[in-house]
Amino acid sequence: MAIGESELLSRAGDLGLSSHLNFIRRVLRPAVTILRDERPLEVGQSRFGGIPDLPAGATWPTHDDGPYRFLGQLNFTELPENRGFLPKTGLLSLFVADDPSGESEYFWGDAGYISAVWLPDSSTVEPIRSPFSDQEQPGTALSFRSTLDIPYDAEQVDDWPFDEAGSDAFRALRTSLHASDDYLLGYPSHCSLAYDPTPPGSLPFLTLGSDESLDWCWHDGDKLMVFIDSDRLRAKDFSELLADAG
């Protein structure tokens, strides 16, 4: 079930945060929870892993150390209405310069670590296998749910108002908003960083947890966070995505 503001504020009150409701209202952001789905994969459908759907004859993206690895694709027509500045239509395929074999020297903070293929019209796409590997790639269909998000920690706001007990209650409130480690928008979440990873002028775009079944291991089993310049998102320009992990 989608979580709205009234439900969130009710939960905050139940956790003893009634005196901080104005702060919570001020820092609220829309987010979209990403859930795994057991449906069979279809062409053009949102997914993590598997085989990307691209235009016929598309060239597989590469970087200086070799081929990118397919991360997943998002069909924006499948997302709920409460989606911030995310597009209403189109297909976005994401690739990562991550190499489980350890041969690539790309770092998740490097420019170009994430590569994207944006298709405003996905009606003519078809599955395109990587010419660099004949290994079958596990994949899973996705479904989406609207939620709201609040800051992950004190580093993400200028005026953190909580003592230790209040911080614990606030973290419990945030945990209740996320049915998955994977989500769009909101605030980035991590396991080990002592700073706000959001670059200046950028918005959190995608946060992903590590997943052994998909061979995802970000920063020793932590999280991958992808960011986009706010003006580029409004222009549907995904050519310069940034990343961090921790």
Which residues does each PLM region occupy?
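Preference for intrinsically disordered or flexible, low-complexity segments
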Residues: 1-246
